[in-house]
Amino acid sequence: MSLKTTAAALHNRNQVLESFEKALNTNDSKKREQLMTFIIVGAGATGIELAGALAEMRKFILPHDYPDLDTSTMRIILIDGGPRLLSAFSPQSSEEVKKYLTHLGVEILLNQQVKNYENNMLVLDDGNFIESANVYWVAGVKANSLAGLPAECYGPGNRLRVNEHNQIQDFKNIFAIGDTALMISEEYPKGHPQVVQPAIQQAMNLIKNLRNIESHELNKESEKYRKGPAAHPF
């Protein structure tokens, strides 16, 4: 399952609730275990937020809405091929988030690659496997290319290199915001995290800039975008 659109996100939320319903009504212990195991592949901002949301759902929603389900049987497993969570953030932020997710009961597997997933069986590159009916793939996401822009406009993840006003490199009248924008600074050497808060703030700043561009009064607030909730413990 992916999380690339609002419709997909709503569908996945319904799938989570449907898994709870099925687990509640099955007498097959193996099937129940698969339904209550949630695997997230990719420990970037999206994967971290999803893991935290599921952990909070287990803590606050399950006991209230599904009192007959044993919440201890719900597993949340976060898998990433890298050595740490949130590779785009500082090591300190990565460690803080790791500690917090561990405190919430999220199982974290680092330096692990997914080799295959079929028939509710996820196989890792070391030969180990996990049975689950719920796998969310949020790893390796990159932006689409825009026809007509030279290759040097693109950075890691195919994101467009922009200045502090969100103007694409070498262009004064083309802008990029949100996930597609790569605004490199001393504070964010790998660009801002691809989450909601920076995108909203960039959009608001761009509105002001478009209104003022003719008078050459571009705002400089874009350098101060907040990281959003993914950068801190939930």
Model-derived regions: residue spans:
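Active-site flanking residues adjacent to catalytic metal/cofactor-binding acidic residues
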Residues: 41, 48, 79, 177-178
